Amino acid sequence: MKSRSRAVYSINPSVDIYKIGEDQVEFYFITTRRRILLDISPTLILALTFVDGRRTLDDIGQIMAIDSQELAPFFDYLLGQRVLLDIEEEIQDLSLLAKVDLDRYDRQINYFRSAYSGGAFSQTKLLEAKVVIFGLGAIGSGIALQLAMAGVRHFILIDGANMMSSSQERHYIFSHAEIGRAKVDIVAEHLSQIDPLISSVLYKEYILPDTDLGKFLADANFIINTLDEPYIGFTSAKIGRVCVQKNLPLFVAGGFDAHLMSTGELIIPGKTPCVDCYLSHFTTTLAGWKPRYNIPPIERELYEVKGRDIDFHVGGLASMALFSISYATITIIDYIVSQGDVKTVYGRGECLFEDLNINYLNVQRDPKCPICSVI
């Protein structure tokens, strides 16, 4: 990235600058908490005071009575670190969005400007994304709401269940008036209320062993699975294997069963462990483990009749679900906006309620995995 002598620069409004002594400056990104500490000359420190969004590099050089090219390497560096913004490039970037979207996503664009290349350009990646969500329970519906607020406008929603009274404890879309209605319909209506430009394709059906997933994934570029019927391991394996074949990123969301503050995991074909790598890991680490449930026997019929409330549920809080929802959404947004250039993938972790620390599993790609080892 080369400075142009006639280019006009401004300081990123999300960056605070602190002078430390005579030859040190710290740049602090308010939004991302990133810090850059530099040992620089008093001349370069002085040059920063003339950056106002109107002066060119030549103008600053003339004011300081020095050759502007002496400042160029320093300005190039700050431009690359997003401390400085090129006004012309910013105008071009903002032209990518309609004014209504610039106004709506103003704060988000400011955040993206510090974290990625081009604030408005980053926002367009969300507006263009086509996201599939399997399962619209507390976690799946919550992720849908947050993605809609962030700017995703194309959803494919799959869930065969109806809203039940038990949903009131954790579902952020719950209303007593909605009990008995299909979750896909309820979620789609909420999304449209957030943004009338959102389009949702709805499938009120369960995922069975013989279900063909092709119709759900045909036009998608990001897949989310929160479907825990019959159980999350089965649905994730079935969906995950197809995602590897189609080179589609998959997020298996947390918040299920006894893992109500799970981070979930981002699965990128060829880069991270796949679902089968996780299954292999658990097969090894949990070998011989047999849980004992201290609850009285419950008639089998209660579990076999879909749509009925069941007397026993693993305990949890709506706020615990919100943690899993928000962690998943941030990870998904990062993948979409960075166009897959994710710097760090932490894998599955769990936030412990007592001390709020997150413990991550050390799951590696299995070199003998029958699904992803050939990638």
Question: Residue spans of the language-model regions?
Answer:
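Adenine nucleotide-associated cytosolic modules
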Residues: M1-I375
